[in-house]
């Protein structure tokens, strides 16, 4: 293994919960303002996941004050403090770009309800 692969392997050890497209997640992100550092929450729906090993990333969309905001996060970025899965969505596609054109109730995603076996 070369040095780059060793470095990537060390970075991948960061624990990240399992989530998929359609899930609502909360991301705690480090923000630097001047000399101060603080954590800011970004809550939204995962609309795309790009799996490329160490270079994996995911796109999260939220609507704030009627304006849609999309942000792409590298999965193993040091600015991500924590990822919390709030709810699992029931979707049939892996890329949910069609949500960009929808407003209000039509942009909602059904919640995935797991069946209990007895």
Swiss-Prot record:
InterPro entries: Ribosomal_bL19, Ribosomal_bL19_CS, Ribosomal_bL19_sf, Translation_prot_SH3-like_sf. Pfam families: Ribosomal_L19. GO terms for cellular component: cytosolic large ribosomal subunit. GO terms for molecular function: structural constituent of ribosome. Transmembrane segments: none annotated. GO terms for biological process: translation. The keyword Zinc-finger does not apply. Belongs to the bacterial ribosomal protein bL19 family. This is Large ribosomal subunit protein bL19. It comes from Buchnera aphidicola subsp. Baizongia pistaciae (strain Bp). The lineage of its organism: Bacteria, Pseudomonadati, Pseudomonadota, Gammaproteobacteria, Enterobacterales.
């Amino acid at each position: 293994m070369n040095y780059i692969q060793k470095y990537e392997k060390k970075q991948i050890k960061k624990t990240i919960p399992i989530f998929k497209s359609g899930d609502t997640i909360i991301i705690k992100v480090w923000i630097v303002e001047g000399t101060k550092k603080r954590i800011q929450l970004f809550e939204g729906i995962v609309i795309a996941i790009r799996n490329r090993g160490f270079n994996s990333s995911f796109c999260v969309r939220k609507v704030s004050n009627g304006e849609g905001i999309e942000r792409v996060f590298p999965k193993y970025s040091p600015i991500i403090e924590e990822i919390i899965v709030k709810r699992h969505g029931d979707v049939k596609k892996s890329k949910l770009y069609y949500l960009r054109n929808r407003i209000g109730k039509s942009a909602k995603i059904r919640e995935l309800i797991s069946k209990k076996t007895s």
